[in-house]
Amino acid sequence: MSMKNQIEQLIVEKVALLNRPDLFRKPIVSFSSATDSRYSELKEIIGPWHLNPTELLPDAQSVISYFVPFTSLVVAEPKTVDGGSEAWGEAYAIINPYFNVVNQAVIQYLSDLGYSASAVQATHTYDPKDMKSMWSHRSAAAIAGLGTFGANRMLITEKGSGGRFCSVLTSATLYEEQAPAETRCLYVKNGSCGLCFKICPVNALVPDSFDKFICQDECNKNQKQDRHGADTCGKCISVCPVAYID
């Protein structure tokens, strides 16, 4: 079995150990070159504060991107409730800290083979004062070919956009050229749909802009009511026709 297949199997097995098939589906994994020019372009698209892989791990050769898709039950709930979703909040609260377990298993596997590796924390990689994040898991996943961005700023994979992304950097050479993915977002494709704009409870998301501060304020409000302590909303994902793909 190739190193890439071993890493993919390791990630799948670790997530399966959660034993929560009611919340999570089988992860999907892909790889990108740490020196892909699109990482440098993120300094223009996102901002100069966004770090390149080699600024996080100097000898990085590859970025491992993976997505843990939520189940249909989890994805469907946020659009049906006021405030935060119980199922979405639980899935979020469980998987975010568990990414540390998955990442450490991957790092240990690579270390045993003589490669350096490090992970970027799954969430809250931004300064709450300015909402500037030093790393975008979704953008890394897009570069790795896992999906394309929709109008709601979420990455739509072959399993949809409802779920969570994470990244591991390594000195191992794992990447291969990925064919450009075709967008699944109906609004991006032909201007139809737009349900994500209509459902946003605070109008943070509109066709030509997204206000991160207003969105985060709504998530913080929901956090006060969430028994899992999750600062989430998920409505713009839940309402999307391609949020869940079987």
State where each predicted segment sits:
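Catalytic cores of enzyme domains
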Residues: 47, 84-246
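Non-catalytic, usually N-terminal nucleic-acid engagement modules in DNA/RNA processing proteins
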Residues: 1-91
